[in-house]
Amino acid sequence: SNLIDGNYVFIRLTQFQKNAAKNISTHIRKMKKKIKKSDNMKGIILDLRSNPGGLLEEAVDVSSIFLKDGIVVSTEGRDPKNKEIRYVKKTGHKELEAPLVVLINGASASASEIVAGALQDTGRAIILGSQSFGKGSVQTVAKIDDE
């Protein structure tokens, strides 16, 4: 992450690995300290270009940095008992109200698309770039009995 024109925070996220949200929050705090007046942060650019995705929970946590509340993603599985699972904003991150731009491209997939979609659908961010990969799906690991 770095500053552009002294007042715009630029964050490049290459994957949604463990602690991605924590690292983004830390970088934003550091950048705000570099800006003479914290209130003068004019905007944040979140670069998700060529980000293939990663951990769903990190995608939810990253979205939660910027969202006040609401649904980040809902999933539908094969089990009729669990047709829809909603991952709602988690607490612990103070949302930022600075204007937000998210950059994506054709190699932005999975968790990147979930974050970009959540931020766009809530009106929180403007999405710029080219069409994303189009995966927009979630995989989970299921234990199979030895029998």
Regions found by a protein language model. Name each.
Residues S1-D145:
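Cleft-lining beta-strand/loop regions that shape enzyme active-site pockets
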